[in-house]
Design a protein with these regions (language model features):
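C-terminal accessory extensions appended to soluble enzyme cores
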Residues: 137-163
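Conserved AdoMet/S-adenosylmethionine-binding subsite of the radical SAM
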Residues: 2-145
Length: 163
């Protein structure tokens, strides 16, 4: 739900979120809400629409790149919030996009904390920004480790890593 914005960002008024959730609840649909601030989801876990929703966060690396990620909560904070959501019984997904240089064991641990039903892996799609990207072999190792506990989807823009 939503596009070009993070509906769950700290600066989004609670009334706006409540209006969106109430509106969505009026339809017999399944929803996917995604945020880099999943701790905000925790405030709404008892909203009726959550019974027919999947909650997703982005964990693009376990590392912190201050020039790139300055406004987003740390990856570990996101994973902790998603762990609480999963423990509450709400299905979760993780998107690793744009996937950046990572430490394999640490990233797998963070993603695993989220208990995701699916992980999507994608590359940077903004050509005006250069990001620290992993090698193809590193991504293949990540995919293999993640597949030990969840479904992994490789987005079309990341197929080059799978060759």
């Amino acid at each position: 739900v939503g596009s070009s914005t993070d509906e769950w960002a700290a600066n989004v008024p609670a009334e706006w979120i409540e209006q969106v959730l109430d509106y969505c609840d009026g339809f017999d649909n399944r929803y996917l809400f995604q945020s880099k601030n999943p701790a905000r989801f925790l405030e709404y876990l008892d909203h009726p629409v959550m019974k027919k929703s999947v909650l997703c966060t982005t964990i693009e690396t376990n590392r912190f790149y201050p020039d790139i990620m300055r406004n987003a909560p740390l990856s570990r904070e996101r994973a902790i919030a998603m762990q609480e959501i999963a423990n509450y019984g709400i299905p979760t997904y993780v998107t690793c996009e744009p996937l950046m240089k990572f430490d394999l064991k640490e990233l797998v641990e963070l993603v695993g904390m989220c208990s995701p039903q699916q992980v999507n892996i994608g590359r940077n799609s903004r050509y005006d920004i250069t990001l620290p990207e992993p090698t193809a072999n590193e991504v293949k190792m990540l995919k293999a480790e993640l597949e030990k506990f969840t479904k992994v989807e490789i987005k079309a823009n990341a197929y080059c890593w799978m060759r």
